């Protein structure tokens, strides 16, 4: 969210933007990486203690011998598309000209760019809510619920008419003020998918690595 807002405020009008406009953000990113390196370098992190093992015959099994782990890996790949797909393709569709080869709605690119921030704000809200209730319900119940909700929202986004509009907040990067614009309600449904995607990674990981025993470390590395 901060990246969308910061880059938008620095670049402003995309039509007149120059590479030099983004340089402050690059220096900020460099400073963050240097700070993180210094902290990690001077922090003594306790590594997991692993007992020395005698040389044994090669294990015939691995984490990939478990069916639910392999399904979890597949689910993570699909989840990745669910997480990054909506903000990317929503922007392309809303800003594409109506007479283009792949026609869109021809909306203002500056406003449409802020919808990515709205999507990730929904993800942030979902993470907070998921963190609060995660200890009270099982990962299976949570994943099942958000998956059904995501399917319903995606279907709504595909089927609802473009003429049905709803107001959605955005950011005027030039003046850093909140603005409201109208988007199809189906697009707003796609944005709400962020609420569902926010808790999927942790839930899928827990379900996929459950009961793996000594193969859990290797499974975690695979993820």
PLM region spans:
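C-terminal transmembrane helical hairpin of 12-TM major facilitator-type secondary transporters
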Residues: 137-204
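Extracytoplasmic gate region of multi-pass secondary transporters
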Residues: 4-8, 63-121, 125
């Amino acid at each position: 969210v901060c990246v969308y807002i910061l880059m938008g405020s620095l670049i402003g009008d995309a039509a007149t933007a120059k590479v030099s406009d983004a340089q402050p953000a690059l220096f900020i990113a460099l400073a963050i990486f240097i700070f993180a390196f210094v902290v990690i370098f001077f922090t003594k992190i306790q590594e997991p203690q692993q007992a020395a093992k005698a040389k044994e015959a090669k294990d015939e099994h691995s984490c990939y011998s478990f069916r639910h782990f392999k399904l979890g890996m597949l689910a993570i790949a699909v989840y990745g598309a669910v997480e990054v797909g909506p903000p990317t393709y929503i922007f392309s569709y809303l800003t594409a000209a109506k007479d283009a080869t792949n026609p869109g709605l021809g909306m203002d690119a500056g406003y449409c760019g802020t919808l990515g921030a709205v999507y990730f704000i929904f993800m942030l809200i979902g993470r907070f809510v998921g963190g609060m209730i995660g200890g009270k319900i099982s990962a299976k119940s949570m994943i099942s619920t958000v998956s059904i909700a995501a399917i319903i929202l995606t279907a709504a986004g595909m089927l609802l008419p473009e003429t049905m509009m709803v107001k959605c907040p955005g950011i005027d990067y030039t003046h850093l003020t909140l603005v409201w614009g109208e988007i199809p309600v189906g697009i707003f449904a796609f944005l709400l998918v962020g609420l569902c995607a926010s808790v999927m990674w942790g839930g899928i990981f827990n379900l996929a690595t459950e009961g793996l025993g000594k193969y859990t470390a290797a499974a975690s590395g695979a993820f």
